[in-house]
Swiss-Prot record:
Residues 360-383 are annotated as: Disordered. It holds the Pfam family MMR_HSR1. GO terms for cellular component: mitochondrion; nucleolus. InterPro entries: G_OBG, GTP-bd, GTP-bd_Obg/CgtA, GTP1_OBG_dom, GTP1_OBG_dom_sf, OBG_GTPase, P-loop_NTPase. Residues 149-344 form the OBG-type G domain. PANTHER family: DEVELOPMENTALLY REGULATED GTP-BINDING PROTEIN-RELATED, GTP-BINDING PROTEIN 10. Belongs to the TRAFAC class OBG-HflX-like GTPase superfamily. OBG GTPase family. This is GTP-binding protein 10. May be involved in the ribosome maturation process.
Length: 383
């Protein structure tokens, strides 16, 4: 049985994992024929990988998504060799693949400090060109965040993520009845009858305070950025890391997971999300599930059990809430279907957005018809 969120259609546009931008190198400067002066070259457009930057930052800061290098300085009597135009440097997140409009790969930026030129500036005017400059290189490029998987499993240690991954995919992760079994991302693939494949990553379990880089905090959260959607996995019986830590209910567990993502990078909450309530084979699981669903219908009214500092500012609207048991196989087919549905919906929205962007760019590039009013000369007047 599957409970769907009341919001039937969710906007997917807030988290950005690909971006289409226009880049143009600067035009070169004019040469000076009478003195043989050389114009300055136009500025290049370069991409620089920098931690902390996201594609959403770029989209918000530069809504026009146009980046143009500076124009080269003309040659003059005072400076026969003109200065080069200013380089337009665009900061992007590490882990980016750059392709042209036809999908041909231009390059990659894997780590902070990596840099690549994506548009060359034009040459300044010299004797060989009759001292006339050339225009800079113009192109439309795509920035794609390299994804480690389509789906990332999010949950506290021992929630059953590894067991779940093993049952819904062909992965064989290490499984044991103790926390922190997973210490690095484990990848699996869900195979569908129409040969569609969806990759799923079992990521190291979070702990409270992961955003402070406790446990494997930042390593885990960094991988979460590189997934298309999130699959929250919670134990219906709740979670307790150790005998000296508080015992959290399933509802509190969901809230704490949301909080960790929010405090690390709030836009992660804009990713499409599915909630799998695991271990439904345990005693009294159905009663606890009913209570959890009521709490999720009105989360803000059920946060009194958590201290103020552990209450998230935002909530996630789960596309689907699916009760499952990795041990018995209960609900796994429903979960697999919900994952596919959410992936397909997200792809449809992205295709529509890309088509709309291309139409808008074509509209801007279409030359406008200039209307002129011609006055009839006296000799053409009819008598």
């Amino acid at each position: 049985m599957v409970w769907c969120c009341r919001v039937l259609l969710r906007k997917y546009g807030n988290f950005v994992d690909n971006l289409r931008i226009y880049v143009k190198g600067g035009t070169g400067g004019m040469g000076l024929p009478r003195l043989g002066g050389q114009g300055g070259n136009g500025g290049d457009v370069c991409l620089l990988a920098k931690k902390g930057v996201t594609l959403k930052n770029i989209k918000d800061k530069y809504p026009h998504k146009r980046f143009i290098g500076g124009v080269g300085v003309n040659s003059s009597v005072r400076a026969l060799k003109g200065l080069a135009g200013e380089v337009c440097q665009v900061e992007v997140p590490p882990g980016i693949v750059i392709t042209n409009e036809h999908g041909v790969k231009i390059g990659e930026l894997d780590k902070e400090g990596d840099e690549i030129r994506v548009a060359r500036g034009g040459h300044g005017g010299i004797f060989k060109t009759d001292f006339l400059p050339s225009k800079g290189q113009t192109r439309v490029i795509h920035l794609d965040l390299k994804l480690i998987s389509d789906v990332g499993l999010v949950g506290f240690p021992n929630a059953g993520k590894s067991s779940l991954l093993g049952k819904i995919s062909h992965a064989k992760p290490q499984v044991a009845d103790y926390a922190f079994t997973t210490v690095k991302p484990e990848l699996g693939k869900i195979m569908y009858p129409d040969y569609k494949q969806v990759s799923v990553a079992d990521l190291p379990g979070l702990i409270e305070g992961a955003h402070y880089n406790r446990g494997m905090g930042h390593k885990f959260l960094k991988h979460i950025e590189r997934t298309k959607q999130l699959l929250f996995v919670v134990d219906i019986a709740g979670f307790q890391l150790s005998a000296i830590t508080p015992c959290r209910s399933a509802f509190e567990t969901v809230q704490l997971l949301i909080l960790e993502l929010q405090l690390y990078k709030e836009e992660l909450l804009d990713k499409p999300a599915v909630l799998a309530v695991n271990k439904m084979d345990l005693p009294n699981a159905d009663e606890k599930l009913g209570e959890l669903l009521k709490q999720l219908e009105n989360p803000t009214g059920n946060l009194h059990s958590l201290p103020d500092e552990l209450v998230p500012e935002r909530q996630i609207e789960f596309k689907h809430i699916v009760p499952v048991s990795a041990a018995t196989g209960q609900g796994l087919e429903d979960l697999i279907g919900c994952i596919r549905k959410t992936i397909d919906e997200q792809a449809d929205v992205q295709i529509q957005e890309l088509a709309q962007e291309r139409l808008q760019s074509l509209h801007k590039e279409t030359p406008r018809t200039v209307k002129r009013n011609f006055q009839t000369s006296p000799r053409h007047k009819h008598h």
